[in-house]
Amino acid sequence: MSKKEIPYKIYLDESEMPKQWYNFRADMINKPAPLLNPATGKPVTLEELSGIFCEELAKQELDDKTPYIDIPDEILQFYKMYRPAPLVRAYHLERYLKTPAKIYYKFEGNNTSGSHKLNSAIAQAYYAKNQGLKGVTTETGAGQWGTALSMACAFLGLDCQVFMVKVSYEQKPFRREVMRTYGANVTPSPSEKTAVGRKIRAEFPDTNGSLGCAISEAVEAATTQEGYRYVLGSVLAQVMIHQSVIGLESKIALDKYGEKPDIIIGCAGGGSNLGGLIAPFMGEKLRGEADYRFIAVEPKSCPSFTRGTYAYDFCDTGAICPLAKMYTLGSSFMPAPNHAGGLRYHGMSSVLSQLYDDKLMEAVSVSQTDVFAAAEEFAKVEGILPAPESSHAIRVAMDEAIKCRETGEEKTILFGLTGTGYFDMYAYEKFNDGKMENYTLTDEEIAASIAKLPKVPGLN
């Protein structure tokens, strides 16, 4: 089809929405390494994992063989409040960059949570409700996940306890208030509420917190209260299963117009958005049906892929969770107060880590001043104020489009616009005032954290 025949926004009909999630682990030749029980060093069992997660979610976490999982009708009906999400052809950005490249972005910010996180929040809350639980606990970085979960829990009548990374709790008070508006109890992490929080505060008295800290507190809170389970917004495979609706919708929309992306780009903190966006395309690559170039974009201040070590590590700072094999900076790593709070995680999804180790995807790291420069250009040209996390993908998508301008190649670029930045104005203020700092880790800082990796006989 010609360029003129492709609309600015491609909206699918509700009848075209995916009815199943896609679990691309089923198509992976090299499966992700199993989660390990830190006490035994052996793969975790369903019974062990069900003590932390809802039973159905524990089953999804351990299932690397079932390619498609039916989406319960109750979840589909909830999705219809904000899905299908638009796939946007960035004509204005293309003209601004004077590039022959075609640029598309999947916009996930058209719901009250402001991001893609609601896709998994409603699924996890649904399974918790079906199990008869009183409530759930969780962590949140920038607050998008906590907001999404508070919405889902309010809708289903569940109690919601959120441990929010301290620096984001202070930088993003309005997102905190959205969570409270939906009935969530929000605590800055590390806190005095949990034993692990008190321990971390004693060891790192000046800490700004981290996702790893908040995870530890949320897990402790879940396992010490009757009728509660822990749910999470990223990193684990169950989350990427739910987020596959992003990529599935994107592929359906592109296929309708005969479009095929050459490059697919997503920001990477724990991997939920990136894994969801690439899911059906990676499936085709794994099955040998098509080839794509996948690029994960992470902050230079927290470069798990580009400077981390591929090893077994704890998913949390307090060493409560199972061990996962992933690209990691070490669970004791305390990231700088980067404004992309959702990307301040020491590790990376085991699924994406395996794909990266198998050279099936690439990764780059970018500085936050370059990211915010791209964010402001995008906002002025495309009319959406992007979240700092999303802006990492925007930065690299623009860079790839500029390369096409220089080479004359007419590549098709797809990136994930994970959400809006309307609650991130403190970060934009710092950038506009010229007070934003870049944080680049030294080799010594990384080595010190990596040296504390757990000793796993025969593995680490």
Per-region residue spans from a language model:
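Active-site nucleophile and cofactor-binding loops and adjacent substrate-binding regions
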Residues: F107-L118, V136-G146, L236-V239, I265-G270, ...
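Short glycine/serine/threonine-rich phosphate/pyrophosphate-binding segments
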Residues: G114, L118-I122, T138-L156, E170-P173, ...
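Active-site/ligand-binding loops adjacent to catalytic centers
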Residues: Y68-D70, I200-Q238, I246, G258, ...
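Claisen-condensing/thiolase-fold acyl-transfer catalytic domains that form or cleave C-C bonds
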Residues: A268-G276, Q368-D433
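Positively charged, low-complexity intrinsically disordered leader regions
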Residues: K3-L133
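A short, small-residue-rich loop immediately preceding and capping a beta-strand
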Residues: S120, A128-V167, K260-L274, F294, ...
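Alpha-helix C-terminal capping segments
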Residues: A123-L133, T147-D159, R180-T181, I278-G288, ...
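Active-site-proximal loop->helix
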Residues: T137, W145-N208, S304-F314, M425-D433
